[in-house]
Amino acid sequence: MLGSLMKSGVEITNDAAQADALIVNTCSFIDSAQEESVDTILESVELRDANRRGQAVIVSGCLSQRFREELPKLLPEVDAFMGIDQVARVGDIVGKAIASRAEKNGNEKLKIKNSKTKISARLNELEKNRDLSAREKEESLRGTDKFGKTKTVVAASRESAANLSLAEGTAAFSRNAATIFDVTSRPVFIPDFETPRFRLTPKHFAYLKIAEGCNHPCSFCIIPRMRGSHRSRTQKDIVAEAKALIADGVKEINLISQDSTYYGLDLRPNHSRAISSPEKFSAAAKSLAADATTICSLLRELNSIKGDFWIRLLYTHPAHWTDELIQTIADCKKVARYVDIPLQHIHENMLERMRRETSQQYIVDLIQKIRAGIPGIALRTTFIVGFPGETESSFETLLDFVRETKFERLGVFTYSQEDGTLAGKMAGQIPDKVKQKRRELVMAAQHKIARQVSENFVGREIKVLVEGQANEKQLQQANVSSWEHGLIREAETSKLQIQNYLIARGEADAPDIDGRIYIRGRLPIGEFAKVKIIGHTDYDLIAEPVA
């Protein structure tokens, strides 16, 4: 979006008070993100009305996409709404929104003060009353009868969203012909090499989107409705962007999408969306021509690019792993020895209710194959606790699995009941206190594992990517000063210590989500270096340069 704005000649500023237009890029993945988006929109409107009435407010992103029909009626104060497909035309939309604001300023009747609580409640109500198709109703019952633990209840009585009162907002919206509304019903946009870019990451690493959208039917997730079906970029296009990034000094390319392991399968002739289970995916992969585009062919071509850099594969789906992918990662030395594979649960009933298209035994076997086939691999995963119907027994199965598998990196989310999802309508919702307690138990188990993983690094020499100078807050959060004093007592980090520490990451650490390596000494920032691990804290390592 920033790249498209700059290409259009729009000047970017961090000072909201000086801007002619404010763009609120929203998230609507979970309720808390949705509420934060609404808060930010209304705060922007209040600041505009108090300080600069000529300033246009534009709402973009997932909230606009998810509530494309209702949001303009609920927020007539906003000057423009744009969806995911309109990113490349944002410059034109900004110009129209500024003109719209000028027209609105002449209409005093449009002064409406909205309540953020009222709007958030209304959006939740819209999703609760959304009619489910017959197929969705049938699918919502999956994984219940087999285990006999819980029942899914889909409300039979629904009030049409069109009949719910929106009198004030609808009236204002109908009077306001100047509001810009540009949101397609189902997104199809995907950036390519020609799409303008304005990178927000440091120069030494970048995210490279290889696909957009998702074909998976997970019962807890709203993403397919907001982002559309899975659609892959061409391999040629991705490789061209990767080469440009490497030429610009990038040392780490992080491949991202909603499902990276599905990459390329949608490009084959007569592609069907119903390729989600391991069996169907494996059969489809085997039927591909030798020169077909897949995640394996992409990794191999990226690996062949000249230069010293890492390729990191993020957001893989367990149902879409193949023996070929394991062999490809093992063969490609530039692909980081790191796998991001969100599993979400391990108990059979939970996997089926989540519609994860995998089984407990399949996951156990897959992890064994990955670890055997890629020596030195670091496994990162995430789990959801407190999903509807999660009994004490099914939770204990998950907890035992975490203790036994000993993931190098692990995150835990408490289930968030989302309107508009099948899981949001399921019976057996878990109290928040129970969900939080279960999260704490899993993280306590992982804390012990993480310390052991860190301890196993001590004495080793590894390759790292130097991120920058460590500041006092980072050193205190990592408890580095206590390590300096033999873990005997807390001690304030001295200025000398601050000046002497750098932050780096190893192959086992993705940006932002994993641990750090604190290096005592001086090394070039944004470059690879070899260090020796001399200590550790709970989740982080302490190192010194290898001469």
Positions of PLM-derived features:
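Conserved SAM/AdoMet-binding glycine-rich loop
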Residues: 57, 66, 247-395, 403
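Intrinsically disordered, low-complexity acidic Ser/Thr-rich regulatory segments
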Residues: 145-148, 161-182, 282-294, 303, ...
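Proteins enriched for Cys/Gly/acidic motifs involved in redox and nucleic-acid/cofactor modification
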Residues: 1-263, 324, 339, 362-372, ...
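Intrinsically disordered, low-complexity Ser/Thr- and acidic-rich flexible linkers and loops
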Residues: 112, 116, 137-138, 145, ...
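A structural motif corresponding to the C-terminal lobe/cap of the Radical SAM core domain
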Residues: 334-337, 349-467, 523-527
